[in-house]
Amino acid sequence: MDDLISISDALHIVTPTNFHHEIAIKCLQKNKDVFIEKPITSNTAQATEIIELAVSKECIVQVGHIERFNPTINRLKDIVSEPHYIEIERLAPFQARGTEVPVVLDLMVHDIDLIISMVDSNIVDIHASGAKMMSETVDLAHAHIKFENGVVANLKSSRIAQNYVRKIRTYQNNLYTITDLMIPQIEIYGLEKTSIFSDQCIEKAID
């Protein structure tokens, strides 16, 4: 691996999460930029060490939070400017891969990233619960997040569901949206009309 790092300009780390820290540190010590699949590491101490080393080495570290670049998500952010309440549901059938970390780091991490990008305020309170069902780590989890500006977010993630579900519901004054990332589609409900954005988020108005 050392030889591979030495001859590379940048590296993409796609190993199981418990190896991310060790490999990333080796790359950064040799002044290599890295792209790390989510989650960055299995704990905050290791993540902090990677970030601090990257800063000191002036290297780039990017984590694979791919939903940031989802065109449906970007369209939703254009529509929803001042959300008061957000619900996100991310469910998947069980797979042994990825169970070395809890479902919060395996799936919900995407939605935590989205919530932070949608709400321009600091988090003031978090309540969470979860359960181990089919692995040695938490397989399903709920999180209730409250922001300083009063926005509330409820997140639900499970990797023991029957089907894949990726849904976001937002509520703001006179506007309610349902976003299905599996289709993808955004339904918009307001006082005057209903609109649906689908097929790469092209608007279709319903009279």
Predicted stretch roles:
Residues 36, 61-63, 179:
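Hydrophobic residues in well-ordered beta-strands that form the structural core
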Residues 112-185:
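Contiguous beta-strand/loop segments that form the cofactor/metal-binding neighborhood of enzyme cores
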Residues 66, 172-207:
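C-terminal glycine/acidic-rich active-site capping loop/insertion
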Residues 41-98:
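A contiguous active-site-proximal alpha/beta segment in oxidoreductase catalytic domains
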Residues 1-51:
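Beta-loop-alpha module in the N-terminal Rossmann-like domain of NAD(P)-dependent dehydrogenases
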Residues 1-2, 90, 131:
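Conserved SAM/SAH-binding loop
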Residues 64-71, 94-123, 138:
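Mid-domain beta-loop-alpha active-site segment that forms a flexible
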Residues 30-32, 56-60, 151:
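A short helix->loop->beta-strand "cap" motif at the edges of active sites that frequently abuts
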